[in-house]
Amino acid sequence: MKVLKVKVPATTANLGAGFDTLGLALTLYNEFIVEEHDGVVIETEPKNEFLEIPENNLFIQVIKYACERRGKTFHGAKLKQINRVPVARGLGSSATAIVGAIVVSSAVSKTELTDDIFFDIAYRFEPHPDNLIPAWKGGFITALKDREKTYYNSIDFPEDIKAVVVIPEFELSTEKARSVLPERIPLRDGIFNVQRVSLFLSALQNRRYDLLRVAMEDRFHQPYRKKLIPNFDRVVQNGYDAGALGVSLSGAGSAILALADRNFEEIGKAMTEGFSEAGIRSEYKILDIDREGANLEILE
């Protein structure tokens, strides 16, 4: 009987002005080890009793739905889920489960995983291609969904830039983070963001790292979401003072992303100190860019 292991990277989306558009895969991974089984048995590492209930486990729900979409009956699975991507921090933890389950279901059914099949299943659980695609394909992508069609493209990302991700102890759900956003954006703010996301992509392409600070400014979401994150401005400023090239929320938060080409430890420590001033514990991770995406192995 085959045992399959899929390793799926965390993602960080938006990167400042690229709201619901840009996504980047990081070298932090959740792993899912699956084998056929009569009924569902789930083991989690670290132990998470909530996720060991099949109805609460997103990976199981997705693989069950994927089977149904192919006209198959889901009889069960034995799953070991190794969680390293923190939940509700803006690092795409749900996307890892969705992508992992789709990749495994495609392998089990010996079906080619086309874009149409992938998005048909994935959008049942998450509507954000800027998270889903880098978790699946890896690298740096820009994406949009137009009616029933998804368009995306990969963008070169400099190899000398790392992501310093500062992760506070508190969770921030995507639903709550979206609830504080305005329904309408002034024209001047739309122009502001279009200018900056264009500058951001050009600065990366031409290695003009001196432009990244202004290019990662935003008026679409961060001015509203930062109110949910104590001492946000101080954490960001500490990152810049320590040598960060650009700093922004990671996805919807609560994690904060700093792009840097040096001083990685200093940046991480300075930003965690910013949270400490508000009485909030946090940790930082220094991550490279994952360029492979979801990786499937047959263990036996």
From Swiss-Prot:
Name of one Pfam family that matches: GHMP_kinases_C
Stretches that traverse the bilayer: none
Single GO term (MF): homoserine kinase activity
Keywords: Amino-acid biosynthesis, ATP-binding, Cytoplasm, Kinase, Nucleotide-binding, Threonine biosynthesis, Transferase
Signal sequence bounds: none
SUPFAM superfamilies found in the cross-reference section: GHMP Kinase, C-terminal domain, Ribosomal protein S5 domain 2-like
InterPro entries linked: GHMP_kinase_C_dom, GHMP_kinase_C_sf, GHMP_kinase_N_dom, GHMP_knse_ATP-bd_CS, Homoserine_kinase, Ribosomal_Su5_D2-typ_SF, Ribsml_uS5_D2-typ_fold_subgr
Pathway: Amino-acid biosynthesis; L-threonine biosynthesis; L-threonine from L-aspartate: step 4/5
Gene Ontology BP, a term: threonine biosynthetic process
Catalyzed chemical reaction(s): L-homoserine + ATP = O-phospho-L-homoserine + ADP + H(+)
Enzyme Commission code: 2.7.1.39
Subcellular location: Cytoplasm
Matching HAMAP family: Homoser_kinase
Family as reported in the entry's similarity comment: Belongs to the GHMP kinase family. Homoserine kinase subfamily.
Function per UniProt: Catalyzes the ATP-dependent phosphorylation of L-homoserine to L-homoserine phosphate.
Protein name: Homoserine kinase
Source organism (scientific name): Persephonella marina (strain DSM 14350 / EX-H1)
Organism ancestry: Bacteria, Pseudomonadati, Aquificota, Aquificia, Aquificales
